[in-house]
Design a protein with these regions (language model features):
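Rossmann-fold cofactor-recognition segment
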Residues: 49-66
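Conserved glycine-rich Rossmann-like NAD(P)H-binding loop of the short-chain dehydrogenase/reductase
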Residues: 26-42
């Protein structure tokens, strides 16, 4: 039984939960983190009973930057793998007219994830091991009128992950960039997605698990 631990940030998302299942099935213990951990109680029980692993729940808010260092230090143990599934899409038209909404999108997709990963990157570097998995998006590959605020925030996170990977490459720390396209999740419920090229959360979760095991740098 593999007793390594995986921390999943933004654990309430569909992709995060699917990813958790793949690691749990392989025997990894889980640390599930989200803003409202009460909604994770049922998942904790399910994982523990189904996979015979240890699961702990932790309150985490990506936008509360000042709390990130405390969060990292308060975990029962430093995880071996961290998956960041934090993110927010919003509506482009509303984001264009409301700077506070736009700021929330940018902070949720870039500033918050980059902040918490910076803290754990230093801890992993000191230990000499670990894997950081950041879920970005192909929307960050090119600016488009219909989603450039969301896309630009993801572009920033993609570049951050690339630089972090280069920095830590010789330090025993692996950084994975995940770039999903269309995925049928709660976040895309209000969007009409092209069925032929739309993935399911399980496809992404499996790809993340395989990337960690095979030490793949970039996953589409």
């Amino acid at each position: 039984m593999n007793k390594e631990t995986v921390l999943i940030l933004g654990a309430r998302s569909d992709i995060a939960m699917s990813t958790a299942h793949f690691f749990a099935k392989a025997g990894y213990d889980l640390q599930l983190a989200a803003r409202n951990i009460n909604t994770l109680d049922q998942y904790k029980s399910n994982f523990e009973q189904k996979y015979q692993i240890n699961v702990t729940l932790h309150e985490f808010d990506a936008l509360k930057i000042n709390s990130h260092k405390y969060f990292a230090n308060s975990l029962p143990e430093l995880p071996n793998i961290i998956v960041c599934a934090v993110g927010c899409m919003g509506e482009q038209k509303k984001n264009e007219q409301d700077i506070e909404l736009a700021s929330n999108i940018i902070r949720s997709n870039f500033e918050g994830p980059a902040s918490i990963f910076s803290i754990f990157a230093n801890l992993f570097e000191q230990r000499g091991s670990g894997t950081l998995v950041g879920i970005s998006s192909v929307a960050g590959e090119r600016g488009r009128a219909k989603n450039y605020i969301y896309g630009s925030s993801k572009a920033g996170f993609t570049v951050f992950l690339s630089g972090l990977r280069n920095r830590l490459a010789m330090r025993g720390v692996h950084v994975v960039t995940v770039l999903p396209g269309f995925v049928a999740t709660k976040m895309t419920d209000n969007i009409q997605l092209p069925k032929k090229i739309t993935a399911q959360p399980d496809h992404v979760g499996k790809a993340i698990f395989n990337a960690v095991k095979k030490k793949t740098n970039i996953v589409y």
